Amino acid sequence: MSLTRLNIEAFRNIQSAQLIPAPGINLIYGQNGSGKTSILEAIYFLGMGRSFRSHLSQRVINNDDDKLTLFATLNLARGDSKIGLRRFRSGETEVRIDGEKVKRLSTLAETLPIQVITPESFSLLFEGPKSRRQFIDWGAFHADPQFYGAWTNVRRVLKQRNQLLRNGSSYSNIQFWDQEFVRYAEQVTEIRNHYVDSLNELLKGIIGEFLPSVDVKVSFTRGWDSKTDFAELLENQYSRDLATGHTVSGPHKADLRLRVGTLPAQDALSRGQLKLLVCALRIAQGKLLKQQIDKHSIYLVDDLPSELDAQHRQLLLKQLTDTGAQVFVTAIDPAAIVDSLHTPPSRMFHVEQGRVTVIE
């Protein structure tokens, strides 16, 4: 899978741009503030319906416009597919895939799987369990068609249960919801656990190349003691949950733990090693997607030269090239990327003040 055409209108400082990307490595270069990261952000927005730089999606709309428009042609195994997205300043989002209106943004993610490696990727290790759950759930969503339904039901039942707790409801009123909660929680947990087991098999080899002298252990924690029956736990913790006004244990507390010896990876590794660990996780996830559903991710790599030294840039770019996936990588100085590649980039784009030029 690859993007063969990308149109961007009124997205940040890009008033209008059309790119014809190539399979393989697409290098986008320009000075800070030129708009090169905005191209990556636009691709991500098209695949996720939101930005990886801001939680306020209206901010990505150009100041002179009331809406942004993104359009892409995808080359898929079954043929070409066309995706269009409009985001209005009012907050409304309009999505079409092959001319048909799409109601769920999850359909975008299913159609256009994206991996992002940016200077902010450290959030995966430092921001607490939520970002790591999202990492697991991205893979579980793509790997198992049952996951999304079970996950949305967990969220629905958990919301209802927490509302009852805040209202001071008796356990007899909560028990019905607990039966549903247990059923969907166990389904989500089984899929997550299986996914992490599969990821681990690939991850060992990639971490071995990036960090050959470091033994990183990766494990999944479900959000409650695995030796305890979840239904019993919910009943036994009712008084505690009632006092706090929310459900203390469950799949919403799951985590992906990375340890070196007895220490969390973020305490045991240097900043440079942690960068490589995050890169390894993203590459492993993309490779596993290809194995499981025969679909490539698209990789968006922002400001690579500032994040890794020359040796590790070369190693990362080799790993990305070996995936066979389409890659978009940004840099201020194109030589920093070109010199780290074994072969020239498939295509190069220069960005200046929001204007994009292909370099022949």
UniProtKB/Swiss-Prot annotation:
GO terms for molecular function: ATP binding; single-stranded DNA binding. The keyword DNA damage applies. It is found in: Cytoplasm. GO terms for biological process: DNA replication; DNA synthesis involved in DNA repair; double-strand break repair; SOS response. InterPro entries: DNA-binding_RecF, DNA-binding_RecF_CS, P-loop_NTPase, RecF/RecN/SMC_N, RecF_2. Pfam families: SMC_N. The RecF protein is involved in DNA metabolism; it is required for DNA replication and normal SOS inducibility. RecF binds preferentially to single-stranded, linear DNA. It also seems to bind ATP. This is DNA replication and repair protein RecF. The gene is recF.
